[in-house]
Curated annotation (Swiss-Prot):
Keywords: Endoplasmic reticulum, Isomerase, Membrane, Mitochondrion, Multifunctional enzyme, NAD, Oxidoreductase, Steroidogenesis, Transmembrane, Transmembrane helix. 3-beta-HSD is a bifunctional enzyme, that catalyzes the oxidative conversion of Delta(5)-ene-3-beta-hydroxy steroid, and the oxidative conversion of ketosteroids. The 3-beta-HSD enzymatic system plays a crucial role in the biosynthesis of all classes of hormonal steroids. InterPro entries: 3Beta_OHSteriod_DH/Estase (IPR002225), Lipid_A_modif_metabolic_enz (IPR050177), NAD(P)-bd_dom_sf (IPR036291). GO terms for cellular component: cytoplasm; endoplasmic reticulum membrane; intracellular membrane-bounded organelle; mitochondrial membrane. Pathway: Lipid metabolism; steroid biosynthesis. One of its GO terms (molecular function) is steroid Delta-isomerase activity. NAD(+) binds at K159. Its main location: endoplasmic reticulum. It comes from Equus caballus. The gene is HSD3B. It is a single-pass membrane protein. This is 3 beta-hydroxysteroid dehydrogenase/Delta 5-->4-isomerase.
Length: 373
């Protein structure tokens, strides 16, 4: 399939832009279409420089705009759908999250059907699998266990519904008589340079005398570096374009991790930032079970006030569970079916992320030294 093209939604985001950079290096790619609601000027400039390697078309528009999606998909050979509202703290209006994550995915699938795009790769989330209880322990989980979140919180629920829609669409007929083939990737918590979460935590730490929040002491996860999850999308695309590998991939979901050591989310943040004197908050915290039931009470208050006031609790039971669970997964199935191997080692991922944090923190170096003395 010489001269193929690929549409990447969410291409202005943390993960999407990394996928675009890798796609540029793929053989025989004729065009990359980068779609997002808005692109930062510096990213637009970077993408324009990539034009020397391949045709790169920037498309600004709404994932809920049906006509826009149909135009974006016209003539494309594959779609990588990363566009999503990622919101575990419920900052967004729940209906907006559901609309973007579920309806947006359904509209894009329909656009692929009408434009006869044969390959659709969806960026799902480990959140679609749980954890459902902070007492639940999943270590080296795998796809055959068919774990599924029971939470109705907008983010995990919307991602679950969207993934189901994508996998159910596998095998559907296209307008030109062809067939749509789909798969979904479930990344762990994604870290790396440009991470919105790390950016927020670093600035919060700078404003808090070099002290990092310590909410996830009892968690154990295996975070994945952004360069490796981006690479997994490339491997999935190659596999779905390969007649020998494609039958094993079609309609499947895959957990994507790498060789980052299992650790708590707090420990990861500390490891990446400790050279600047950041430290974890040592103050006593509420026991998990008390925080869980406090979250339940806050959810009840939010529900009771909803007719007259939109109160959004600072945390809910899903977030408390997420922050305090043992929940790790293996990437062996992706390794077996699509040949995925992490492109970056833990040491390289740590080095790259730390250098990015250095650039964030360095302008505040003197103030940070004073605060941490």
């Amino acid at each position: 399939m010489a001269g193929w093209s690929c549409l990447v939604t969410g291409a202005g985001g943390f993960l999407g832009q990394r996928i675009v950079r890798l796609l540029v290096e793929e053989k025989e790619v004729q065009e990359i279409r980068a779609l997002d609601k808005v692109f930062r000027p510096e990213l637009r400039e970077e993408f324009s420089k990539l034009q020397s390697k391949v045709k790169l078309t920037v498309l600004e528009g709404d994932i809920l705009d049906e006509q826009f999606l149909k135009r974006a998909c016209q003539g494309a050979s594959a779609v990588i759908h990363t566009a999503s509202i990622i919101d575990v703290t419920n900052l967004f209006n729940p209906q907006v999250t559901m609309n973007v994550n579920v309806e947006g995915t359904q509209l894009l699938l329909e656009a692929c059907s009408q434009a006869s795009v044969p390959i659709f790769i969806y960026t799902s989330s480990v959140a679609v699998a749980g954890p459902n209880s902070y007492r639940e322990i999943i270590q080296n989980g795998h796809e055959e266990a068919h774990l599924e979140t029971k939470w109705s919180s907008p983010y995990p629920y919307s991602k679950k519904l969207a993934e189901k829609a994508v996998l159910a669409a596998n095998g559907l007929p296209l307008k030109n008589g062809g067939t749509l083939y789909t798969c979904a990737l479930r990344p762990m918590f994604i870290y790396g340079e440009g991470s919105p979460t790390l950016y927020y935590l670093m600035h919060e730490g700078l404003n808090n005398n070099g002290i990092l929040t310590h909410n996830c002491k009892f968690s154990r996860a295996n975070p994945v570096y952004v360069g490796n999850i981006a690479w997994a999308h490339i491997m999935a695309l190659r596999a779905l374009r390969d007649p020998k590998k494609a039958p094993s991939i079609q309609g499947q979901f895959y957990y994507i991790s790498d060789d980052t050591p299992p650790q708590s989310y707090d420990d990861l943040t500390y490891t990446l930032s400790k050279k600047w004197g950041f430290c974890l908050d040592s103050r006593m915290r509420l026991p998990i079970f008390l925080k869980y039931w406090l979250a339940f009470l806050l959810e009840i208050v939010s529900f009771l006030l909803s007719p007259i006031y939109k109160y959004r609790p600072p945390f809910d039971r899903h977030l408390v569970t997420w922050q305090n669970s043992v929940f790790t997964f293996s990437y062996k199935k992706a390794q077996r079916d699509m040949g995925y191997e992490p492109l970056f080692s833990w040491e390289e991922a740590k080095k790259r992320t730390t250098e990015w944090i250095d650039a964030l923190v360095e302008p505040h170096q003197e103030a940070l030294k004073t605060k941490t003395l």
